[in-house]
Amino acid sequence: LLFCIFLFACNQVDNKQVDNQNQEQFQEWKVGNFHYSEGSFKYLIHRTTDYQEEFLLQDGLLVRFKLNWENDSVYTMKFDSILSNPNQTQLAFDITQIQKKCTMTKVTAHSYIERSENNLNDLVGLTRIIKNTRD
């Protein structure tokens, strides 16, 4: 019995260390400069505690989303404004209505997989978000 209690106590300490490491990894992704690709399109991300700006390299389109963090690994993005659209890019859907719920999965020091769902369709998106090597 004493041995079982000892094993349980050791596992609890190990789990807390893992939780603290995960929390630190998630914290590194809340603010910073990142990028991702979808097909031939390349996007740059600038994220603050309250907003995420996404810049489409090919068109110069710059869109800002309001961020709401539900916990360390889940956040929602809601359209805020188009900051720049020099080529008058036509969007395939009404971006002003979009709201995405994103979950960080497979988090490492260099990237994570964003699992996203939005209010415009029933599709689940999986996108690798990569930390820029120079901020």
Positions of the model-derived regions?
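An anionic, turn-rich surface loop/hairpin at beta-sheet edges
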Residues: F79-T105
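Edge beta-strand at a domain terminus
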Residues: E70-D72, N119-D135
